[in-house]
């Protein structure tokens, strides 16, 4: 090993400890379930509370959804559109699975340019142009260089470089800027990351030109082609930008609905004059708006479910293997919960739109990999899907409680009723998190031979569990009976969720950091 530190191999044998630990998990799980079903319990009492039986408020009318398309018209040699379209359905081996050629071509263009198409041409036309006339395409500025420092080193005036810009004769210009690290665990600077990213793009072009990128199915039949139905499903999935469309839609509707909710609350407290109230009411309080919001919520849920189901069908596994997929699942959970509680708690609707919209925005803009790839063997486990599903359900509920707290700070008169709602959601949220931690421990024991390793993700999940668990003890800790303190606590407590999910993945690392890979 270059680090000269060697490797540690451990063997664990702990039959008594595992038995006692699993028994504790089981007892705690039974007790959590009993707290939910016990007739005299706090959870059932909250369900019967008169304040939570009151109807809700809000409605709104229109939204505007638009997306800009930037097409560069250039006289570049490329495949004819008809030939390119016929090539899109051809099956190749890519990322260790059989895919339509469209998937490979789309990822190629997306990797180079940051967009799924280029210059008004389809991905197949672009990749065909690189194969047929590389001497022309190597002078086309289509390699996106985001880092300004690297652009200055390369003397680029725009964010896009051509392949020829990265070579000085036969010398590779990026090589002189890169100083390889002796310690591979040492963190790279932003410039070094940009150099590595640009080098990967150059490597992708070179792989295409030397024939190693495109791998057709072998003629000996050792790799079976996939069905036409699955090919058509993947082409449809590549064609529709599910995340982009839905995060724009959800955030737009959610913000309008949230402002409507604030307006209704302020009207009840006579904060707005009657004249202004009449004007706003004319805009927002119509029967059409009353129909529009529920319809939009169900439509958004079905659209997200359709996209998620397509990804499941195409990949042949539950999409919970990386950060992109868990954000997609969290958005689905948020929309599902909003649909579930819409009639009893109408103010959950804007929360569902906002939470799902931000989750989809994070998956769209963040450093999360949208490619569909097979899971590493350790992740191919029935424990994984249940473990991640429960954890993400709990995160969605915690996010609802955080938004509920923000709303309560704006609508002080409704603070007590909103506190009761948050306390009601607290039970399933903490129990989902606890059950997810338990199943994660069982999965870890089956995969690595130990159920707890003090990994950063495990530690922060436990911290989150304990922080939210403290709010159960309102009888002992009387301060939790105060609505204002309770809501502020729920807002601050959500920081532990953010640290558990994003902080561990991108800052602390650990065994769970593959979630963003």
Tell me what each language-model feature is:
Residues 1-283, 287-517:
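Solvent-exposed, non-transmembrane regions of integral membrane proteins
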């Amino acid at each position: 090993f270059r680090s000269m530190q060697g490797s540690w191999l451990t063997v664990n044998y702990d039959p008594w400890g595992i038995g006692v630990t699993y028994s504790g998990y089981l007892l705690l799980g039974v007790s959590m379930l009993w707290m939910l079903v016990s007739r005299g319990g706090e959870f059932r009492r909250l369900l019967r509370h008169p304040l939570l039986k009151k109807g809700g408020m809000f409605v709104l009318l229109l939204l505007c959804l638009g997306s800009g398309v930037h097409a560069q018209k250039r006289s570049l040699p490329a495949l004819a559109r008809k030939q390119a379209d016929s090539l899109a359905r051809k099956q190749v081996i890519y990322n260790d699975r059989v895919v339509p050629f469209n998937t490979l071509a789309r990822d190629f263009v997306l990797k180079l340019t940051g967009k799924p198409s280029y210059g008004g041409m389809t991905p197949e036309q672009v990749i065909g142009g690189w194969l047929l006339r590389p001497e022309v395409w190597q002078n086309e500025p289509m390699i996106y260089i985001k880092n300004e420092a690297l652009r200055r080193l390369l003397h680029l005036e725009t964010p896009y470089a051509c392949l020829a810009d990265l070579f000085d004769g036969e010398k590779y210009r990026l090589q002189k800027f890169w100083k390889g690290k002796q310690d591979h665990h040492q963190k790279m600077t932003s410039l070094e990351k940009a150099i590595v990213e640009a080098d990967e793009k150059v490597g992708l072009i070179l792989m295409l030109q030397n024939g190693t990128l495109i791998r057709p199915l072998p003629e000996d039949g050792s790799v079976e082609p996939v069905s036409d139905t699955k090919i058509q499903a993947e082409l449809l999935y590549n064609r529709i930008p599910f995340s982009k469309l839905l995060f724009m839609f959800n955030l737009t509707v959610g913000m309008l609905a949230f402002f409507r909710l604030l307006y209704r609350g302020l009207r009840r407290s006579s904060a707005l004059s009657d004249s202004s109230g009449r004007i706003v009411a004319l805009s927002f309080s119509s029967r059409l708006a009353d129909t529009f919001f529920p319809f939009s919520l169900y439509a958004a849920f079905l659209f997200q479910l359709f996209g998620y189901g397509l990804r499941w069908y195409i990949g042949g596994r539950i999409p919970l293997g990386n950060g992109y997929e868990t954000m997609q699942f969290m958005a689905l959970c948020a929309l599902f919960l909003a649909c579930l509680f819409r009639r009893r708690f109408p103010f959950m609707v804007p929360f569902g739109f906002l939470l799902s919209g931000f989750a989809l925005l994070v998956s769209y803009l963040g450093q999360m990999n949208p490619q569909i790839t097979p899971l590493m063997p350790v992740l191919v486990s029935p424990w994984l899907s249940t473990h991640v599903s429960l954890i993400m359900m709990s995160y969605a509920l915690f996010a609802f409680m955080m938004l509920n707290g923000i709303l309560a700070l704006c609508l002080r008169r409704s603070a007590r009723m909103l506190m009761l709602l948050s306390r009601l959601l607290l039970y399933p949220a903490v129990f989902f998190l606890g059950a997810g931690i338990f199943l994660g421990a069982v999965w870890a024991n089956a995969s690595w031979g130990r159920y707890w390793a003090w990994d950063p993700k495990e530690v922060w999940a436990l911290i989150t569990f304990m922080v939210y668990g403290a709010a159960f003890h309102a009888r002992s800790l009387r301060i939790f009976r105060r609505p204002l303190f309770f809501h502020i606590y729920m807002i601050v407590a959500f920081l532990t969720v953010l640290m558990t999910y994003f902080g561990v993945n991108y800052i602390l690392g650990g065994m769970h950091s593959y979630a963003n890979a």
